[in-house]
Amino acid sequence: MSKSITHLVLDTGGIICSSTLLRNSAESFYTIPRVIAEIRDETSRKNFELWGDQVIQRVPKPEFIKKVSEFAKQTGDYSSLSVTDIQILALTYELEVEFNGGDWRLRKYPGQKHINGKPPSNSNSTEDASKPTSSDTASVKETENSDPKSAENEVLEGETTQHSNNKEAHPNTEENKEQEDNEEDDEDDGWITPSNIRKKKAEDGVGESLVQPKHLKVACATTDFSMQNVLLQIGLNLVSSDGFKIQNVKRFVLRCHGCYTVVKDMEKKFCPSCGGNTLIKTTCSINSKGEFQVHLKKNFEWKTRGTKYSLPKPVHGTSNGKGKKNPVLREDQPEYQRAVRRMQRKKEIDLMDEDYLPSLLTGVTKDRMYVQIGAGRKNPNEVRRKKR
């Protein structure tokens, strides 16, 4: 039995679910050491043992990590991707270049319409098969260029002759119409039948648009929507392990809810105009006129609960840097600037580190990759239980 995928890159979700359909869909499987390190609980370890020696661990090259990172920054998904996610995307990119004869069909920036170069000679046959034939295009052009007035006259003539024939053959037309209307109302009560199932699928957006090609050389199995968004915009093949897949690709920007400033740097936490922590991730697009549009949520309300609370007294620094720290409230605070530099440096080192050791071997358990702003996500005015 021939497999539908030759090389499949697995995310953590694809390994944990251990789907039989996923294991039987590809000839070879790839992942990175970070994914194996994320599998910690007993149930997930047992599911990973079902894969046996089928999964090949491989670290992507730094050049592909750099390409994927730059592309994710342009789509606005870079801040939502972890180091593991970026390496999974880079490994898929590397395998696509290796087994598909280069990056001729991949996009270098979002929205690119033309390919990068000529495809290899062995893929010409598949491309020619997907192109429409000259007879098909000619028939389409003929129907488009035909005179609409003559077509309307023919339809009207046909309707008048059919109407006159029906009058002669069926004198009781009103009774027949009432019976037909009643029958149609009884049939179309919302039931899905074999006759209208295609129409229902087309209305729901499920149909031929989601059908995968017969054979894929390289694909990636992930359940993360940010990774799926980057994969589809680059042009890489996507396989969903749990059946949930995005239908439309999106680009994101940050919009300040206080002063309505649009910020394209997705790593920003504070608005560069008003300085508040009021940036919200929103989708954006460019219309046919070339105008930039931001798509806001309908009836959106900014939650003010937990935004007013008492601040502790400022604490002076210590020589060793330990002790209580002042809460981060603005971007120009030294505490925030040091934390941002530390995170950027650590992320760059981890992305380019080929000699990566999992946290199970190094013993590092707590390593936050974000800065707590203010009181954090929890409501500081909420009454909490006392610890015993």
Curated annotation (Swiss-Prot):
The keyword DNA-binding does not apply. Belongs to the NOB1 family. One of its GO terms (cellular component) is nucleolus. Residues 177-190 have a biased composition (Acidic residues). Signal peptide: none annotated. Keywords: Cytoplasm, Endonuclease, Hydrolase, Metal-binding, Nuclease, Nucleus, Ribosome biogenesis, Zinc, Zinc-finger. Its main location: cytoplasm. CDD domains: PIN_Nob1-like (cd09876). Residues 139-152, 165-176 have a biased composition (Basic and acidic residues). Component of the small ribosomal subunit, ribosomal RNA processing complex (SSU RRP complex). Residues 119-138 have a biased composition (Polar residues). InterPro entries: NOB1, Nob1_euk, NOB1_Zf-like_sf, NOB1_Zn-bd, PIN_dom, Ribonuclease_PIN. The lineage of its organism: Eukaryota, Fungi, Dikarya, Ascomycota, Taphrinomycotina. Required for the synthesis of 40S ribosome subunits. Has a role in processing 20S pre-rRNA into the mature 18S rRNA, where it is required for cleavage at the 3' end of the mature 18S rRNA (D-site). Accompanies the 20S pre-rRNA from the nucleus to the cytoplasm. It is found in: Cytoplasm; Nucleus, Nucleolus. Gene3D superfamilies: 5'-nuclease, Nin one binding (NOB1), Zn-ribbon-like. Residues 110-206, 311-333 are annotated as: Disordered. GO terms for biological process: maturation of SSU-rRNA. A zinc finger (NOB1) spans 246-317. Zn(2+) binds at C256, C259, C271, C274. This is 20S-pre-rRNA D-site endonuclease nob1. GO terms for molecular function: RNA binding; RNA endonuclease activity; zinc ion binding. Its EC number is 3.1.-.-. SMART domains: PINc.
